[in-house]
Amino acid sequence: MSNKRNRPVKNTPGGAFLFPRKPASALPFPRGCGMLTGERMIHMAKLYFKYGAMGSSKSAQALITKFNYEELGMRVWLIKPSVDTRDGKSVIRSRIGLHQQADAVPPEADLCALYRGMEKTDVIIADECQFFTPEQIDQLRTLVDEDNVPVLCFGLRTDFLTHLFPGSARLFEVADSITEIKTVCACGAKAIVNARIDGQGRVVTAGEQVFLGGNDAYIAMCHRCWKKAVREHKTVRRP
């Protein structure tokens, strides 16, 4: 018979369970999750990267994760790159209607300095991480290692030409945990391409890597459908 008092109360994004507060000697000790020093359990923080194509509910998962941590009484620092202004400079908004205020971080900002100069939080959640600079990703890695604060990053893997974003590339190199958030193409296959569509419904194959203005839209497509649309100059239904 299971002991209800010892049941986990939440499943965190990293796959670990959060248990009710108890004496350190009574806490479980999962392999690789922490270390014992005397009578204290010190949980070792990790850097998580959850990536997916457009429309895979990355922002929704980021905001739901924030809610879950706060429901447990934990303090969350919610951040996004300042270059992402689609929904407002300091707002994270999901397609399902969830939205939250977030700190917009400019590319020249030092995330270590920002974090260490504010009231300490229990976790950092970062959305649209593909737009962070590689140096800022390294700063998040430093906060995990030196300040023992978990960092959960959400973002795209590749741009509209299937090339890695610099921030995402660095996350693939230094993250402890990497998880794909899957979505599907209109044909039903797995979508991996973030296709850029112009005002006439044509797939764009040239331009700046980061372009958030104008009449262009983005949709998730499988590689086969994307290549066919490019080759045959097919019109794609815009979202």
Give names to the regions the model predicted.
Residues 5-23, 29-32:
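Positively charged N-terminal leader segments that act as targeting/secretion signals
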Residues 131-132:
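Residues immediately C-terminal
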Residues 197-203, 232-239:
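Short cysteine/histidine-rich zinc-coordinating motifs and their immediately flanking basic loops
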Residues 184-211:
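Short recognition patches in nucleic-acid-associated and regulatory proteins
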Residues 27, 35-40:
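Short, positively charged and aromatic/hydrophobic N-terminal segments
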Residues 42-115, 159-170, 180-183, 212-238:
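Conserved P-loop
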Residues 128:
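Walker B catalytic acidic pair
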Residues 144-166:
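Sensor-1/coupling segment of RecA-like P-loop NTPase cores
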